Amino acid sequence: MPDYAIGDVQGCYDPLQRLLELIDFNEKEDCLWFVGDLVNRGPDSLAVLRFIYSLPVKPKITLGNHDLHLLGLLFGGQPWKGHDDTLEEVMLADDGEELGHWLRKQSLLCRSSELNIVMCHAGIAPLWDLSKAMDLANELEAVLSGDSYHEFFAQMYGNKPDIWSDDLVGLDRLRVITNYFTRMRYCDAHGRLDLGYKGTLSKAPNHLYPWFEVPCRKEIEMDIVFGHWAALMGRSSHPRIHAIDTGCLWGGQLTALRLQDRQRFSVPGYGVSRFE
């Protein structure tokens, strides 16, 4: 009964099915861990959601920024972002709201002591140890799954605050927690988020670091599995930090990481790379 962490699917239903065939997935025994961004940009977000929702073994899911965007559209009155969105089919589906309520009750962080794994969409803020990250994930999850979710989704967007402080309260506190867990790529040497630059490591401004290389980063005693960052193409500088967004939608692959032995499996995705 292996566990597999799956990279950013982003509505790519056919590659997901090919990947599951490659790993000889047994839906009655195996457990899938989805790193987030189940939806958007790809052609089949509704099919992806329906498939994952129907799995007999409950999957572990950490929410990504595109998942939160869908929830903002469904429940927060957020406007369409533009031509890149491919969420209309979900919005118009008879079961779209039901799927949305299921999605908003998923996690920001999943962990397994047995597998020595912690998973989140974008990463763990350099300023947090694992205990802090777990507490803050629980805090935000309580809002997403609780009665005040409409208010949060209506106001979740924004790049400020851009650094964690224990003194933060209210929406500012929830927004920075959200941005670290779901949007983070680069930080400065003090752990301050930079949400502007999204390019390759080789062209990054000198003052920015990948979140997992920030000099002040607190050590996490478990292996970290994350997605979100297709430009890394599955590579990180740390042997215990596993990047599994391999650009399925951008000329890359869709990747599964078997958590028992950290072996990778990949199938071709769609499109032409925008990172060349």
From Swiss-Prot:
Transmembrane segments: none annotated. It is an enzyme of class 3 (hydrolase). Gene3D superfamilies: 3.60.21.10. It catalyses: P(1),P(4)-bis(5'-adenosyl) tetraphosphate + H2O = 2 ADP + 2 H(+). CDD domains: MPP_ApaH. GO terms for molecular function: bis(5'-nucleosyl)-tetraphosphatase (symmetrical) activity. Hydrolyzes diadenosine 5',5'''-P1,P4-tetraphosphate to yield ADP. This is Bis(5'-nucleosyl)-tetraphosphatase, symmetrical. It comes from Legionella pneumophila subsp. pneumophila (strain Philadelphia 1 / ATCC 33152 / DSM 7513). The gene is apaH.
